[in-house]
């Protein structure tokens, strides 16, 4: 499993993830890159779930971004429709977090496209821990940057969740929101 966190604050949007890949109860890799930039560096995307499935979804999402000239919401809705109705895609087990300067979204295989409250996404096995940490930091420390909130939340999740480590990949964009 994994932990992915995205935070919007003070004109920035940040997305980060840990690097652990597990097979059952065994750590197979500790430095996987689960967050990346798509569509000419304008979109951040991260995944939780089966790695091979996530790469398929990244590829499909990037195709939708190209098809819709980088329009994040439209591309997300079209991917969710395909994911739900295409027989081969419907068996994929992963979730995507995507963000650009305007919006942050979670895309699921159930056809859900959700824009979370507070500009905060936290998902994966350590998502609950990371969400609690990030919300506390956002509500009680106005001086921390989006990057500092995301990094701290991921490190806290990595210290609690056995399927999350503290080898982080963090990407950042300027935000319109």
UniProtKB/Swiss-Prot annotation:
Catalytic-site annotation from UniProt: 2
Descriptive protein name: ATP-dependent protease subunit HslV
Binding site for Na(+): 158, 161, 164
Protein's organism: Pseudomonas aeruginosa (strain ATCC 15692 / DSM 22644 / CIP 104116 / JCM 14847 / LMG 12228 / 1C / PRS 101 / PAO1)
InterPro entries hit by this protein: ATP-dep_Prtase_HsIV_su, Ntn_hydrolases_N, Proteasome_sua/b, Proteasome_suB-type
A single cellular component GO annotation: proteasome core complex
Protein encoded by which gene: hslV
Oligomeric form and interacting partners: A double ring-shaped homohexamer of HslV is capped on each side by a ring-shaped HslU homohexamer. The assembly of the HslU/HslV complex is dependent on binding of ATP.
Pfam family, one: Proteasome
EC class of the enzyme, as a word: hydrolase
Enzyme Commission numbers on file: 3.4.25.2
Keyword set, alphabetical order: Allosteric enzyme, Cytoplasm, Hydrolase, Metal-binding, Protease, Sodium, Threonine protease
A single GO BP: proteolysis involved in protein catabolic process
Domain of life where this protein originates: Bacteria
Subcellular location: Cytoplasm
Regulation of catalytic or functional activity: Allosterically activated by HslU binding.
Catalytic activity entry: ATP-dependent cleavage of peptide bonds with broad specificity
GO MF annotations in UniProt: metal ion binding; threonine-type endopeptidase activity
């Amino acid at each position: 499993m994994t932990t992915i966190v995205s935070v919007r604050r003070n004109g920035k949007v940040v997305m980060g993830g840990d690097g652990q890949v597990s097979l059952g109860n065994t750590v197979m890799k500790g430095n996987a890159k689960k967050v990346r930039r798509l569509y000419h560096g304008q979109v951040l995307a991260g995944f939780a779930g089966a790695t091979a499935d996530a790469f398929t979804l990244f590829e499909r999402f990037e195709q939708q971004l190209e098809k819709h000239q980088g329009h994040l919401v439209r591309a997300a809705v079209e991917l969710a429709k395909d994911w739900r109705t295409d027989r081969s895609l419907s068996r994929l087990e992963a979730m995507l977090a995507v963000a650009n300067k305007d919006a942050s979204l979670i895309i699921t295989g159930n056809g859900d496209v959700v824009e979370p409250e507070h500009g905060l996404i936290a998902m994966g096995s350590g998502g609950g821990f990371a969400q609690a940490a990030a919300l506390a930091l956002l509500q009680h420390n106005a001086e921390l940057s989006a990057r500092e909130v995301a990094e701290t939340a991921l490190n806290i999740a990595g210290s609690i969740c056995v399927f999350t480590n503290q080898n982080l990949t963090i990407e950042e964009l300027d935000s319109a929101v």
